[in-house]
């Protein structure tokens, strides 16, 4: 006979493997049938197991035919964990389970068919659900806390209508289960109605515990007995009820008397017969009849209790917290209007009324409009009431043409209206102050309407002492320039002393520089020299400024005598290096080189020769030297070129100096070219590999004589690593330049020298261009 323990261990291992496969919801019934087969085919049959164990196994797995079930040991309980009915009663909080994991005695299995088969895609009616609950499964304490359900389907006989599927659906729809902690509607039992059908997947998916449902319902029902101050706010309250409840709980106003409001939900199972909040009608009647305002009663009414809108001497919502005990009134404390109001309302006494505050009036804190001097809401002041009738507006006639204001009228509006006869007698301090000087721009733009003898242009003596201030104003500068154009000889003499004294400040001013340029045109010879001396005091500041460099170039164009040119060069040369390297100052030097004759520029060129390296390696300085080479000739040019050739090996490797060396080569003066190439011999290949110097080497190849070019080519081809030169991003252009200017013998020499590296460079980026040019030149 087979050992019972061995067979039991084999059977348990086999069943644990089936359980670990995580069967689908429908596969559990297959395992139930399989377990039945094992039980029937066992060699021990029913004699191998104890009656209690066999009854527990068979009744718990597939056929619970009796009204009660025997306890199941904890060691055997894991065997049935795949059963959906068992998982149904393992929910959290199920009080019906004991520590021995026994089923509740009220669970009965009542299948409509013998084996209750469930196959995929098959629907089962609610009448075929595998179990019902009897009243014994519900404790008496739970039953007492569950209200009676009135509407349910009586066609199906159940022990307790409330716990039927339809009742669960009703509870969910009514909102009674909305506040159940850690649960969702889709986690409850299926809540289909009796007439609907439920698929197998729905039935197996929607499973939970009736006991958990009962506990949560009891907790929810127990909230009805809480005090109003201890009751938590529930989201199921309607908006109007919640707002009303919050107003009553939070407000300390005597208008809101405390009411015992019962818990309100959306469910029809609970009564909503709580006491409605009733307002004190006497307060409202007194308010409407006598227009009285009780001091302690603020108008924080609910929407449905909002009193009728009546005229009020104040707006409570606009009061500050510290002023809430007093009333705002637009009337004065000692006015008759307040006395009349105080007779109707004793609250409106002088001690209870704040005095009229301009700040509050501007904020419109009263009910009546406060800004009575505006036409509309854009605060366009026209002296009319804001709600004036459009029909009563005065019709405007045709607009009168505006008369042009004269300059004299504008000046008189600034200095005061005086006649030309007595204008000079008025002290200047009385005519011009600091505040008026600041507002000069606005006053000069004013337009007059009448012409009179008093509106003539005053004598310029009235402006003396303040010309520099007027020149810095846009309209003042234009006005003074116009005066200069009208009477240049007299007015220039009057303006010059003050302009000369502030010439440095005016030359860099956005508006004053135009006055300096205009005055230099009408100034005499002595005045021009004096102005140049004044400019020399701040030549660097003037030439480095955006406005100063423009005014300085304009003055250079107006220099006519050698004396003026010599004086200007004498002023510029000490600051030559600073001005030549400046973005704005370089334009002043270029203007001098282009405007003055070369013989007058000799001091300037000699100064550049002394600072050649500094200027040649600067972005703006190299441009100045190139302009000098173009303007000079003879000895001056030779001196500059000698200085450049002397340092050409250093300059050719500089980002800006190489342009100066190329400019000397572009002069196409053969002695200069040969001297430069002689400086490069021995470094042709190294210079060809560099970015800046390779451009100068190409320029040497173009301008060199044939004999000199052949010497350069031999040095280039004799480089040990010729492949590096041919494939270099800069040196390959030097080789292409050799091929462009080489004759037949030189091309043959190039082909013979690079033939051994052609297979290596024919597929490179730069080597392909060299071979293509070499092939085209040899074939032609």
UniProtKB/Swiss-Prot annotation:
One Gene Ontology molecular-function label: mRNA binding
Keyword NADP recorded: no
Polar residues: compositionally biased ranges: 358-382
Cellular component GO terms, alphabetical: cytoplasm
Coiled coil region boundaries: none
Chain positions covered by the region annotation Disordered: 1-29, 298-330, 358-411
Organism: Schizosaccharomyces pombe (strain 972 / ATCC 24843) (Fission yeast)
Ranges annotated as biased composition (Low complexity): 311-322
Taxonomic superkingdom: Eukaryota
Protein name per its UniProtKB record: Pumilio domain-containing protein C4G8.03c
Comp. bias regions, Basic and acidic residues: 298-307
Record key words, sorted: Repeat
GO terms for biological process, alphabetical: nuclear-transcribed mRNA catabolic process, deadenylation-dependent decay; post-transcriptional regulation of gene expression
Lineage: Eukaryota, Fungi, Dikarya, Ascomycota, Taphrinomycotina
The Pumilio repeat ranges on this chain: 462-497, 498-533, 534-569, 570-606, 607-642, 643-678, 679-714, 715-752, 753-780
Alphabetized Gene3D superfamilies for the sequence: Leucine-rich Repeat Variant (1.25.10.10)
Domain PUM-HD: 435-778
InterPro entries registered for this protein in UniProt: ARM-like, ARM-type_fold, PUM-HD, Pumilio_RNA-bd, Pumilio_RNA-bd_rpt
